[in-house]
A protein has these predicted regions:
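Acidic, metal/ion-coordinating pockets
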Residues: 31-179
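Short, linear, compositionally biased motifs with a strong N-terminal bias
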Residues: 10, 23-24
Length: 179
């Protein structure tokens, strides 16, 4: 197992830098160039691959599950092909199927969603550091992270803390940080 360092100071500094950069970028945009962008966002999926009853919503109707999520994403992308789908992490830990497969079933299911980028959450480490790295290799979408390091602050675990997507003439930066 490798040592893991996540610096809160670095997260704070990065947030300030991002806000400054974003403000600087916006100051050069013409108001006549306004475009609409749809961002679909998931987080804390917690391996709920199958629908379940949520009694606070309905005593009888099942909700959620990856099949329902995939249907919603597909419908939105048919209506709006430039929509972006991102996930903020915590997709491994949850019902028995994730535990039995140590996250493998979750990554395989996520590959069908058409995710543009995802981050790592704390629950991706629930089955161990080495297992998490092994499962993440199977992801068919970019895993982004700019503040998880191998044995010190100089070597990031992932080579890509960010990506830049292009949609309808827009360049969109997506940065991954572990909270």
């Amino acid at each position: 197992m490798k040592n893991l360092f996540i610096s809160g100071t670095q997260v704070s500094m990065l947030k300030k830098t991002l806000i400054t950069t974003f403000t600087f970028f916006l100051s050069f945009q013409s108001l006549t160039e306004v475009k609409e962008l749809t961002i679909l966002h998931t987080n804390d999926l917690h391996a709920h691959l199958f629908p379940r009853i949520a009694p606070w919503i309905s005593e009888s109707r099942k909700i959620g599950g990856f099949a329902n999520l995939a249907t919603l994403v597909k419908q939105e992308k048919q209506f709006n092909p430039s929509a972006i789908l991102i996930d903020a992490g915590d997709y491994f830990s949850g019902p028995y199927l994730s535990t039995l497969t140590e996250g493998e079933a979750v990554i395989k299911s996520m590959n069908y969603l058409g995710i543009d980028a995802a981050c790592i959450g704390n629950h991706e480490f629930d089955h161990g550091w080495d297992n998490m790295l092994e499962q993440i290799k199977e992801a068919e979408f970019p895993i982004l992270n700019g503040n998880i390091f191998y044995e010190g602050p100089d070597k990031l675990v992932w080579d890509n803390p960010y990506i830049i997507l292009e949609r309808e003439g827009l360049r969109i930066g997506i940065i991954g940080l572990h909270g």
